Amino acid sequence: MRPRGAAFAAGPPGDLHLGTAIGFAGAIWRSRSPAMSTLLDIKSSVLRQVQVCPSFRRRTEQDPGSASADPQEPATGAWKPGDGVEFFAHMRLMLKKGEGRQGLPCLEVPLRSGSPAPPEPVDPSLGLRALAPEEVEMLYEEALYTVLYRAGTMGPDQVDDEEALLSYLQQVFGTSLEEHTEAIERVRKAKAPTYALKVSVMRAKNLLAKDPNGFSDPYCMLGILPASDATREPRAQKEQRFGFRKGSKRGGPLPAKCIQVTEVKSSTLNPVWKEHFLFEIEDVSTDQLHLDIWDHDDDVSLVEACRKLNEVIGLKGMGRYFKQIVKSARANGTAGPTEDHTDDFLGCLNIPVREVPVAGVDRWFKLEPRSSASRVQGHCHLVLKLITTQRDTAMSQRGRSGFLSHLLLLSHLLRLEHSAEEPNSSSWRGELSTPAATILCLHGAQSNLSPLQLAVLHWQVSSRHHQTCTLDYSYLLGLLEDMQAHWEEAPSLPQEQEESLADSLSAFSEFGLQLLRQLRDYFPATNSTAVHRLELLLKCLGKLQLFQPSFEICPFESELNMDIAAALKRGNREWYDRILNDKSPREQPGPQRLPGLVVLADAVYDDLQFCYSVYASLFHSILNVDVFTLTFRQLERLVAEEAWVLTEELSPKMTLEVASGLFELYLTLADLQRFWDSIPGRDSRSLALAGIHAPFLPAVKLWFQVLRDQAKWRLQGAVDMDTLEPVDASSRHSSSAATAGLCLSHIQELWVRLAWPDPAQAQGLGTQLGQDVCEATLFYTELLRKKVDTQPGAAGEAVSEALCVVLNNVELVRKAAGQALKGLAWPEGATGPEGVLPRPLLSCTQALDDDLQREAHTVTAHLTSKMVGDIRKYVQHISLSPDSIQNDEAVAPLMKYLDEKLALLNASLVKGNLSRVLEALWELLLQAILQALGANRDVSADFYSRFHFTLEALVSFFHAEGQGLPLESLRDGSYKRLKEELRLHKCSTRECIEQFYLDKLKQRTLEQNRFGRLSVRCHYEAAEQRLAVEVLHAADLLPLDANGLSDPFVIVELGPPHLFPLVRSQRTQVKTRTLHPVYDELFYFSVPAEACRRRAACVLFTVMDHDWLSTNDFAGEAALGLGGVTGVARPQVGGGARAGQPVTLHLCRPRAQVRSALRRLEGRTSKEAQEFVKKLKELEKCMEADP
């Protein structure tokens, strides 16, 4: 490989700080809620809104009682014992540092500076050598000669004013007017250049078909018409165009200076030739290029004749000779010797040489007819360029090629144009002034430089100039792309020019590698301008790698990527050593080096973040270089070496200060490992940091012990300073709760960030940390209780406000502690399911929640106890209200009282606590109404209707359209009991009796096998209108006699009595000394089917124990609804006395619900109610207590 350029002389700019974007962590939970509305309409008595929305957010500002401002740098000294504020301030800084290290960084840097990029190094010695005065004079003469002897047509973006161009040259070469005039005179006296026209016949399209097969066999004849022939007989030319054909009657022979012929393309109307010709020009202003396109015939040897004509081109009378050849060739054809053969002509072109643009022309020309009788169509694609073949200049005479002359002229003009525009700017894109561009275009054309050579020259000059005075990389990239495009079209250069290009590419690649070596200095990731410049530089290097000529003259394909990797590695090591020597010199003792090593590790992490989010995608997409892996591996290994050595040195000297530094250092090293693991396909077990946690374990344990003590001291100080008042208008808790929640949140976040990798060790650390959290939380609630107990005016209203704050504090800390404990889940790979707490910690967590819930309920009971007397007073007001007033008027005082009280509580309590208070008040109200109902007997139905209205109004009030308690909880428990009481109190006596039997039917399925079983069979005989009830047998009855047996018999009766008023009860025989009697007795009851279909209609079986000496004992009962009996619900099938299937009934004893119906009937004064109650009480005398 060729040596790469000169040495990189300029030094780097000053060290640039790669800042770390650190987010703010920690916010105190606040509780916000819409205020509860006041009672706007007493009649509606519905509370519209009681919801509050507490939230637990960490404050971005400092927590109460902390220092006035957080320190900007991590504290390096040990904190004072008992100073929890300083300890947690230090911990907050560690958490802030880790906030930006969660997962993979974004693939772009959100905060980038738009300031100018750092200046790149320049070295004037890397440019082209300065010209000697004599060489400058020759270059000046070369430029003047180019302007004075220009030829062709100037383009619209070029300067056509000769004086303007000469004046520009005088200015850029810095000559006086006298010197300038003398130079012009010398050049004018020089011999004019020899001009030539380069013609490339590329292709034609849409030609006319001349052959029977629908195609033609086209070929071109072209030549230069000299001035003598082109200007004579203008009248004849006006009638017809010149053509290379046989003579006609219209004029004499038309000589051609040189006639060239292309190949014949058979059977096509769109021929492609791509043939090139060079014609000498005598007079640029008058000579013309003429081109004919003919259809070739097999029997005509015109092409051969033309080729023979070119061999004698020096003879006089060439035109007549050409005419003779045409005649001879045509004579052998089918046409006569005097015919025009117009069918063979396909079109012609006449192009004055003076109309050829200076830069050449590459376009399609429309074919023209030679006379009005000709019929042509189609276009011909030509490339024309006017050049000079001999130049009378000093450079030409000394053998300087046009390539070298143009290089010197371009370099001179580019340097002067740049210095005139923006001498110190790196954004200049090589925009030359119009005179400069015109002169370079003229010189390039006259020197016969190909587009590839011009592109190579522009690249060589600009890339060299860039190393002396920085240019815009987009300009250089454009030059490389232009050069590559032209190389693909014509990949050939003289050997000397190829070698010159190779040196240029090699020098630029070396320059780029030196910049990449100092990547962080010249292209900082936080500077958008610098990153964009880096992208363009990489594209330039990538273009060198993919540039076809570089494969032949510079072996970049196999070496450039390795060179880039080597430059990046060397730059990484230099950057690392610079920070290490500045922050943590190896000459210092371990404890003094530790803070600096923390800074170094943080700098490495931040650098790798920038590398991943900014540099990696650029290098990979453009050069296919994995810069992130390369950088990570190298820096991670260097940091790991320092960490292993330092921990081994500091382990025997473990102090609080050392533990703090090691703990912070480990967090960053663990972040590095997680960073690598978070990338798909990467495994940190292969890193040098693998297993680094082991030597840090003693420091972590010591730090956790200090954390426990510091948390208690911090909470003690917060409670001491607390006034038990909300911290602001938007909060419902006091300052100590905010501090406690923040501390617990920090502990949980710290554990998450620690993510200790060893499962067994993590179990022990997590369990201990969780116990510390529980202990600190209970410690705080105990401090609160002592605080509120010592508040003055314990019996006054102020205590209620303080209790509300305490209740809110307990709720906030309960949630904070629960959230913190949830974060102490098992690490991946530990025993047990992921996310499950260890059993001791889970037990501690449940115990903590129970204690805090109990504490909250105690405070809630204390708050609501002050409202019990008032609630009873307002309920009594409802019960004593006369029937003459409306229900809403009777309820209004209670609703107004509740609205006022709950509005005050809503303003003071968070949602969870307000719900707890609402539930307590709801239960108080239900019990008060139940007591009022029990205290009032023999009252009107309006009394119960009023309380029914009150109950529904309270449900709406406490539900508050979904903003209060849910309907499911409101309509449960005591509400159901009260609702049933009100319903039954509103019922008639017979409805109450029916409810009594319905309750019996419901209770038969609640208890099984406790009091035995009874098998019966029932059916209804429609023909006789009677009900047949057959008692079959019983089993597992209760032993009611001293001998362990019973003498059971069964009483069979129909109920309710008012449905079957004429039916008497019947009984079976007594079966002595048995618990499994068999009866097989059939009883008939003459009753109508309609009565049996009533909802409460049933057969009641009562099993009694016969006692000869005293009252019979009650053994159990069972009820069977008649609605499902065969013959009642559906017609009897099969007939017979024993139709239907046996039914097994489980015996039971009346439950409280059934007995309550009896108590409701006791208050009735009607005869029917009293007789029914008397009968039931006689039965109760026979009952014993439930076993």
From Swiss-Prot:
<dbReference type="InterPro" id="IPR014770">
    <property type="entry name" value="Munc13_1"/>
</dbReference>
<feature type="binding site">
    <location>
        <position position="1047"/>
    </location>
    <ligand>
        <name>Ca(2+) 2</name>
    </ligand>
</feature>
<dbReference type="GO" id="GO:0042147">
    <property type="term" value="P:retrograde transport, endosome to Golgi"/>
</dbReference>
<keyword id="KW-0268">Exocytosis</keyword>
<dbReference type="Pfam" id="PF00168">
    <property type="entry name" value="C2"/>
</dbReference>
<dbReference type="InterPro" id="IPR000008">
    <property type="entry name" value="C2_dom"/>
</dbReference>
<comment type="function">
    <text>Functions in endosome to Golgi retrograde transport. In response to calcium influx, may interact with SNARE fusion receptors and membrane phospholipids to mediate endosome fusion with the trans-Golgi network. By promoting the recycling of secretory vesicle transmembrane proteins, it indirectly controls dense-core secretory vesicle biogenesis, maturation and their ability to mediate the constitutive and regulated secretion of neurotransmitters and hormones.</text>
</comment>
<keyword id="KW-0813">Transport</keyword>
<dbReference type="GO" id="GO:0031902">
    <property type="term" value="C:late endosome membrane"/>
</dbReference>
<dbReference type="GO" id="GO:0055038">
    <property type="term" value="C:recycling endosome membrane"/>
</dbReference>
<feature type="binding site">
    <location>
        <position position="211"/>
    </location>
    <ligand>
        <name>Ca(2+) 1</name>
    </ligand>
</feature>
<dbReference type="GO" id="GO:0032228">
    <property type="term" value="P:regulation of synaptic transmission, GABAergic"/>
</dbReference>
<keyword id="KW-0963">Cytoplasm</keyword>
<feature type="domain" description="C2 1">
    <location>
        <begin position="176"/>
        <end position="335"/>
    </location>
</feature>
<dbReference type="GO" id="GO:0098793">
    <property type="term" value="C:presynapse"/>
</dbReference>
<dbReference type="GO" id="GO:0099503">
    <property type="term" value="C:secretory vesicle"/>
</dbReference>
<feature type="region of interest" description="Disordered">
    <location>
        <begin position="55"/>
        <end position="81"/>
    </location>
</feature>
<dbReference type="Pfam" id="PF06292">
    <property type="entry name" value="MUN"/>
</dbReference>
<feature type="binding site">
    <location>
        <position position="1113"/>
    </location>
    <ligand>
        <name>Ca(2+) 3</name>
    </ligand>
</feature>
<dbReference type="GO" id="GO:0001956">
    <property type="term" value="P:positive regulation of neurotransmitter secretion"/>
</dbReference>
<dbReference type="GO" id="GO:0005829">
    <property type="term" value="C:cytosol"/>
</dbReference>
<feature type="domain" description="MHD2">
    <location>
        <begin position="888"/>
        <end position="996"/>
    </location>
</feature>
<comment type="subunit">
    <text>Interacts with ADGRB1; this interaction is direct. Interacts with endosomal SNARE proteins VAMP3, VAMP4, STX6 and STX16; this interaction is increased in the presence of calcium.</text>
</comment>
<dbReference type="GO" id="GO:0032588">
    <property type="term" value="C:trans-Golgi network membrane"/>
</dbReference>
<dbReference type="InterPro" id="IPR014772">
    <property type="entry name" value="Munc13_dom-2"/>
</dbReference>
<protein>
    <recommendedName>
        <fullName>BAI1-associated protein 3</fullName>
    </recommendedName>
</protein>
<keyword id="KW-0333">Golgi apparatus</keyword>
<dbReference type="GO" id="GO:0019905">
    <property type="term" value="F:syntaxin binding"/>
</dbReference>
<feature type="binding site">
    <location>
        <position position="1110"/>
    </location>
    <ligand>
        <name>Ca(2+) 4</name>
    </ligand>
</feature>
<keyword id="KW-0677">Repeat</keyword>
<keyword id="KW-0472">Membrane</keyword>
<dbReference type="GO" id="GO:0035774">
    <property type="term" value="P:positive regulation of insulin secretion involved in cellular response to glucose stimulus"/>
</dbReference>
<dbReference type="GO" id="GO:0005509">
    <property type="term" value="F:calcium ion binding"/>
</dbReference>
<comment type="similarity">
    <text>Belongs to the unc-13 family.</text>
</comment>
<keyword id="KW-0479">Metal-binding</keyword>
<dbReference type="InterPro" id="IPR010439">
    <property type="entry name" value="MUN_dom"/>
</dbReference>
<keyword id="KW-0106">Calcium</keyword>
<feature type="binding site">
    <location>
        <position position="1113"/>
    </location>
    <ligand>
        <name>Ca(2+) 4</name>
    </ligand>
</feature>
<feature type="binding site">
    <location>
        <position position="1041"/>
    </location>
    <ligand>
        <name>Ca(2+) 2</name>
    </ligand>
</feature>
<feature type="domain" description="MHD1">
    <location>
        <begin position="663"/>
        <end position="784"/>
    </location>
</feature>
<feature type="binding site">
    <location>
        <position position="217"/>
    </location>
    <ligand>
        <name>Ca(2+) 1</name>
    </ligand>
</feature>
<feature type="binding site">
    <location>
        <position position="295"/>
    </location>
    <ligand>
        <name>Ca(2+) 1</name>
    </ligand>
</feature>
